[in-house]
Amino acid sequence: MKTMKVTQIKSGAHRLKSHKACLMGLGLRRIGHTVEVEDTPSTRGMVNRINYMVKVEEA
């Protein structure tokens, strides 16, 4: 299955609870942290919701 690399580039502090939940759901903990996740509709939805806080690369 396809994967994508997601890197957190902005802090999760003082954000909406749903946006913090998306960060936790993707496994992102701090600025500069990168995770590799499967490219599924659910992960795409989380990434789209917090697109201003993350950078996405196709892996």
Swiss-Prot record:
Cite the Pfam families for this sequence: Ribosomal_L30 (PF00327)
Listed name of the protein: Large ribosomal subunit protein uL30
Organism encoding this protein? Psychrobacter sp. (strain PRwf-1)
Record-level Gene Ontology MF annotations: structural constituent of ribosome
Family that this chain belongs to: Belongs to the universal ribosomal protein uL30 family.
Give the highest taxon in the source lineage. Bacteria
GO cellular component entries:
cytosolic large ribosomal subunit
Question: Which residues fall in a coiled-coil region?
Answer: none
Q: Does ATP-binding show up as a keyword for this record? A: no
Keywords for this entry? Answer: Ribonucleoprotein, Ribosomal protein
UniProt entry tagged with the keyword Ribonucleoprotein: yes
The record lists the membrane-crossing segments as none
